Amino acid sequence: MFVDEAWGSHFGFHPALPEGALALGADLVISSTHKLGGSLTQSAMLHLAEGPFADRLEPLVDRAFRLVQSTSASALLTASLDLTRRALVTGTDRITGSVEAAEKIRGVVRALGRFGVVGDGFHRFADITAADPLRIALDTRAGGITGHEARRLLFRDHQVMVEVATDAAIVAVVGAGSAPDADRFLEALHRLPAPLDDRTPGSGSRSPGREPLRLPRPGPARLTAREAFLGPARVVRAEEAVGMVSADTLAAYPPGIPNVLPGEVITSEAVEFLRRTAAAPGGHVRGALDPGVSRLRVVAP
């Protein structure tokens, strides 16, 4: 089993954190230590487990690594990886402080009642077995503001930067071993306006844009990704692309997971989702031909 442990390089280094992928039986793990571990950007770790497949995997991994390895390795990146390793191994007390700060934020948010704590609903999903306590996902629409607008105003008015925003939520991340000012964050959060709560008197209707974005269902696959990507293609207006086969991978960010793959039929709900995401503050679509997703590349007939 290969695991992309992008946001879990700190897992397993504190009793309050989930177990790391290696401890759970993974054979090969890529940990993006630059995200939450503390190493410099562009640095990461590749771990090979001492499991039944290790002897077979090691020469294959070594061969693949040498294929892309730089002949001018960065001493700065390597040193930062070693410092990160040491900080995680010896930082139990510091991580305790980080977890306590995150729990304080969630506790106050619950007590005040304006915003929702997304993680409080995780128990309803059997496939969620653990959650990172250092990631604080908050339902901003419950508090009358979109996630994108909340993120923008938190930074503009309070110099508070959250990790990511969606139409309905923000995610604040506490670095493992860091000591955030929880009171400052909570004050800034609860000073946000609530424009979505403004309604026409007597209308009972929601404000424009009140309905949250929902992930589109994937369209049916008509070709393999290889056939669609390498085959002849043409560019059409997004509206015309509905019902045609995509030649590109299109991924709305956040979170950056593909919504349309080469070879899949482009649906109207996918076009709407991609364009609304692109129009939102901080949103963009990877793989799109232009920022507004006005044109799409499709497989030529």
Regions picked out by a protein language model, each given a short descriptive name:
Residues 1, 27-28, 45, 135, ...:
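Structural motif
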Residues 1-121:
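Conserved PLP-enzyme active-site core in the AAT-like
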Residues 20-24, 36-40, 128-130, 163-166, ...:
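Solvent-exposed alpha-helices and their adjacent loops that cap or buttress functional pockets
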Residues 34-36, 51-53, 83-84, 141-143, ...:
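Short, glycine-/Ser/Thr-/acidic-enriched flexible segments
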Residues 58-62, 80-88, 129-134, 164-170, ...:
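Short acidic (Asp/Glu) and glycine-rich catalytic loops that position anionic groups and cofactors
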Residues 93-170, 176, 197-219:
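Conserved small-domain helix->loop->beta segment predominantly found in fold-type I
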Residues 153-157, 163-301:
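PLP-dependent enzyme catalytic core of the Aspartate aminotransferase-like
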